[in-house]
């Protein structure tokens, strides 16, 4: 067990809650102590839902451990079924309750309810939230479709032609507390509809048990988020012969590749690629003169596997960035992330320790960070621009407006979210660079009103920061002046390298010449 202030994923029962909360006519009875009810806040505060998750907690206390906690479980299950009248019941236990070994799933199945009961055995001390969500969706799909296994022929992707109708697909993987899932579904449905393809079921988001039973009415499955849906897609392929897509439509090239993959599987005529490229503004802007200063910018990427891999492809192939680091906290996606890292000639970082990520970020010295909410905090400490591309996220990353990551509009959103921090960074650098100019002296900073910092105070503040008495190093005025000309997002690295060079050469005072020599030494 590891004590930490912050974690990328919750325990697996939080993943199960995500699936239950995403669906209708399903209830989740969770054997857990009172303290585990904190998970409700994730949905009401972060996701900003209008209702609580469909979860009943047994909320046992210390005094209950001396008695029969199994009876407490049965009492809560009975009350939940009578009150909420679900069509399917999920039963599981939290990490604390797992130690008691009451086996609530087995207890529920022995109570004689006339409904499907899914017993969730989620190993809390070896697995995490995304695995819990994936396993819950997999067990739910398996339970509701088990009677149809072997009762029909394998499903052909060309069945729609025989039936004389438009092809149908399922969109699998979107869930609550996923990154922009709600808007991604709308965007992908729109793209599929333009291609003459109907959506049969979207699951788990917005689906009910009857919808899960209808999954086999479609020709193929769209695996939109591999962390959540890949296990279910594999099971449907093994038992019903349903093909599924592997391309994640994030970015222009991936969206075009996704459309091609769907067309190939369904044997539909392909749409002209040139027409598709004009659906988004990203390709035009990335070729324009205005964006030339973005070329070659160093970028560090960390997030869930799906979004980290997609971000790396967009950064390298569509925006001309140099990816200097990539990693994920999703151990289930480690193999794919390592393969992507190998293509980029960098080493993949697979960890759920945010301090390791911050350390790697510091060493890579990027000009832009693409990460989670935690990387935003780390980047702020390091003075590096950052855009959030993945869960875990804060409430500001769940916008009320339409803001997908996938498809054509998703590419527009991504471009704005990624490039604006760099543009603002350039603006801040120019202000910082010319802060000693006459227009920035006292009396000329009209844009700051009465809050303007006095130029003298600003210079004194910089002088204190630049000197390093611990190492016996002093920055001269010429050295400080030259250092301010370096963009702020790489200034820290330049300052550190110059001081290392000065210590190595035994130079007590750093002038502009020392800075030039250090630059030549480290080049």
UniProtKB/Swiss-Prot annotation:
EC code(s) of this entry: 1.3.7.7
Entry's Gene Ontology BP terms: light-independent chlorophyll biosynthetic process; photosynthesis, dark reaction
Catalyses which reaction(s): chlorophyllide a + oxidized 2[4Fe-4S]-[ferredoxin] + 2 ADP + 2 phosphate = protochlorophyllide a + reduced 2[4Fe-4S]-[ferredoxin] + 2 ATP + 2 H2O
UniProt-annotated catalytic positions: 290 (proton donor)
Biochemical pathway: Porphyrin-containing compound metabolism; chlorophyll biosynthesis (light-independent)
Origin: domain of life: Bacteria
Record field: transmembrane: none
One Pfam family linked to the record: PCP_red
Gene3D superfamilies recorded: 1.20.89.20, Nitrogenase molybdenum iron protein domain, Proto-chlorophyllide reductase 57 kD subunit B
Family matches, as SUPFAM superfamilies: Helical backbone' metal receptor (SSF53807)
Cofactor(s) it depends on: [4Fe-4S] cluster
Keyword terms, alphabetized: 4Fe-4S, ATP-binding, Chlorophyll biosynthesis, Iron, Iron-sulfur, Metal-binding, Nucleotide-binding, Oxidoreductase, Photosynthesis
One MF annotation (Gene Ontology) recorded for this entry: oxidoreductase activity, acting on iron-sulfur proteins as donors
Protein residues bound to substrate: 425-426
Binding annotation for [4Fe-4S] cluster: 36
InterPro entries associated with the record: ChlB/BchB/BchZ, LI-POR_suB-like_C, Nase/OxRdtase_comp1, P-CP_red_C, Protochl_reductB, Protochlorophyllide_Rdtase
PANTHER family named in the record: LIGHT-INDEPENDENT PROTOCHLOROPHYLLIDE REDUCTASE SUBUNIT B
Function description: Component of the dark-operative protochlorophyllide reductase (DPOR) that uses Mg-ATP and reduced ferredoxin to reduce ring D of protochlorophyllide (Pchlide) to form chlorophyllide a (Chlide). This reaction is light-independent. The NB-protein (ChlN-ChlB) is the catalytic component of the complex.
Family: Belongs to the ChlB/BchB/BchZ family.
Quaternary structure and partners: Protochlorophyllide reductase is composed of three subunits; ChlL, ChlN and ChlB. Forms a heterotetramer of two ChlB and two ChlN subunits.
Protein name: Light-independent protochlorophyllide reductase subunit B
Source organism (scientific name): Prochlorococcus marinus (strain MIT 9215)
């Amino acid at each position: 067990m590891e004590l930490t202030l912050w974690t990328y994923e919750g325990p697996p029962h939080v993943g199960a809650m995500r699936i239950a909360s995403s669906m209708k006519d399903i209830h989740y009875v969770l054997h857990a102590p009172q303290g585990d009810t904190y998970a409700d806040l994730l949905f009401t505060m972060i996701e900003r839902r209008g209702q609580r998750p469909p979860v009943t907690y047994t909320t046992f206390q210390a005094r209950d451990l001396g008695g029969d906690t199994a009876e407490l479980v049965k009492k809560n299950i009975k009350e939940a079924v009578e009150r909420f009248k679900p069509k399917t019941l999920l039963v599981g236990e939290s990490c604390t309750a797992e130690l008691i070994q009451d086996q609530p799933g087995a207890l529920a199945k022995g109570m004689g309810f006339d409904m499907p009961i899914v017993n969730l055995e989620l190993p809390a001390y070896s697995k995490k939230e995304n695995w819990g969500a994936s396993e819950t969706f997999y067990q739910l799909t398996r339970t509701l479709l088990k009677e149809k296994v072997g009762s029909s022929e394998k499903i052909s992707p060309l069945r729609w032609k025989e039936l004389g109708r438009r092809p149908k697909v399922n969109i699998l993987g979107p869930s609550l507390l996923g990154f922009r899932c709600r808007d991604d579904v709308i965007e992908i449905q729109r793209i599929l509809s333009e291609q003459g393809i109907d959506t049969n079921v979207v699951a788990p988001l917005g689906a009910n048990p009857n919808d899960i039973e209808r999954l086999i009415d479609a020709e193929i499955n769209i695996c939109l988020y591999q962390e959540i849906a890949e296990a279910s897609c594999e099971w449907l392929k093994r038992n019903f012969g349903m093909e599924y897509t592997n391309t994640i439509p994030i970015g222009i090239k991936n969206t075009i590749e996704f459309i091609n993959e769907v067309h190939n599987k369904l044997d539909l005529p392909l749409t002209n690629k040139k027409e598709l490229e004009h659906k988004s503004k990203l390709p035009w802007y990335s070729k324009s003169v205005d964006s030339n200063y973005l070329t070659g910018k160093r970028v560090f990427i960390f997030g869930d596997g799906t979004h980290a891999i997609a971000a790396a492809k967009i950064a390298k192939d569509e925006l001309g960035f140099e990816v200097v680091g990539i990693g994920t906290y999703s151990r289930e996606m480690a193999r794919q992330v390592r393969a992507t890292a190998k293509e980029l000639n960098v080493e993949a970082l697979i960890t759920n320790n945010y301090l390791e990520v911050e350390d790697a970020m510091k060493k890579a010295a990027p000009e832009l960070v693409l990460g989670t909410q935690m990387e935003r905090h780390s980047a702020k400490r390091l003075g590096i621009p950052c855009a959030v591309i993945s869960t875990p996220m804060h409430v500001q990353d769940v916008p009320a407006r339409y803001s997908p990551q996938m498809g054509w509009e998703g590419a527009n959103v991504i471009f704005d979210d990624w490039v604006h921090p760099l543009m603002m960074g350039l603006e801040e650098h120019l202000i910082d660079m010319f802060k000693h100019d006459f227009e920035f002296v006292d009396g000329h900073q009209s844009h700051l009103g009465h809050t303007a910092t006095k130029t003298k105070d600003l210079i004194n503040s910089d002088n204190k920061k630049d000197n390093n008495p611990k190492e016996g190093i002093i920055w001269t005025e010429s050295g400080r002046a030259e250092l301010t000309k370096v963009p702020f997002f790489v200034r820290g690295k330049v300052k550190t390298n110059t001081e290392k060079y000065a210590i190595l050469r035994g130079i007590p005072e750093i002038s502009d010449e020392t800075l030039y020599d250090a630059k030549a030494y480290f080049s």
